[in-house]
Amino acid sequence: MKKQIAILGSTGSIGTQALQVIEEQSDQYEAYVLTANNRVEELIAQARKFKPEAVVIANETKYAQLKEALADLPIKVYAGTDAICQIVEDSEIDIVLTAMVGYAGLKPTMNAIRARKPIALANKETLVVAGELINDMARLSGTPILPVDSEHSAVFQCLAGELGNPIEKVILTASGGPFRNCTMEQLATVTKAQALKHPNWDMGAKITIDSASMMNKGFEVIEAKWLFGVRPDQIEVVVHPQSIIHSMVQFEDGAVKAQLGMPDMRLPIQYAFSYPQRLKASFPRLDFKMCTNLTFEQPDTTRFRNLALAYEALHKGGNMPCIVNAANEVVVAAFLRDEISFLGMSDVIEKAMSIVSFVAKPEYEDYVATDAMTRRIAQELIKLNSTGIRVSQLPSSSEENKNSK
């Protein structure tokens, strides 16, 4: 029988590529549920092509348009974030691909885990925000979490067949983004258009900005801790501009395994769907005759502070990664609206880390409260920044930033 796939975020970059995988492997998979946040026209087109059992639009104001457009098809139509959380529990679903962007992916992922649905995890923010909670839930329910990020999929593939051999370190590769060789002066004047031009990968706007600022790599460091059970000091980032080696694992005997391939997200998506099998596919093949120059560099955390901030959050633990994620979501949205500078994003994130109340052992309600508080504070900091006030020079609130648990 064909596996029934629920794609949360089907109109985004990962979602559309997942549908390409389903189309190519139509004898193996079917799109059972498709969801989108706002892109109703794209969702309509996908629904008409793939004929899922159900579609969900998070923006309830788009429900009537979606319902009317699909009235001639036997497709169930729902709206609202609660509907997304509920649909993942459908007994017919075999795999849930969490391709939603940001914090919004947390609750649907939790519901899918409770329903014991295998998770193909593309929404890295779920583990960034609440990694310990998600890991505990997955362990107790016996729910597998299969990584879709190319770097974590690479590590996962490197670990296949190792039978628990101890890891010395995980080495995550980073392209370095479009500003790898820029000076601080040049970074200060980076525009939205420049930041949206990634040299190697085709991604959505938010993750492309995160890649340019190296926050994406910082999030991947946090994600790696929870996926592979390694300490922060066992996770190394190296800049590899060619994006051919997707990541590596070094074992305690010094041997290093690497996973290589063309920069194409369809491969890790398909591997998450098919694991432990590999399916024949038409993806572009790596031609080693063309790979004459594979280079590696140390990341510069002075110019790209977000990577250092992510490591700091991981070391501190508790709700600190949640604070970083919420502040980052706010500043990236502001940057895309031309309301804050490229370097100003790091200033706001760092200041939010020093202001928002720290919780050492958070529960789900603490993550919700942390996310809301951080977003409010980050918005206030952006407003101050727009008036010319140097956010980095503002005093921290020692009273608010206390260990509350």
Question: Where do the protein language model's features map onto the residues?
Answer:
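Catalytic, metal-anchored helix/loop core of enzyme active sites in primary metabolism
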Residues: M1-K405
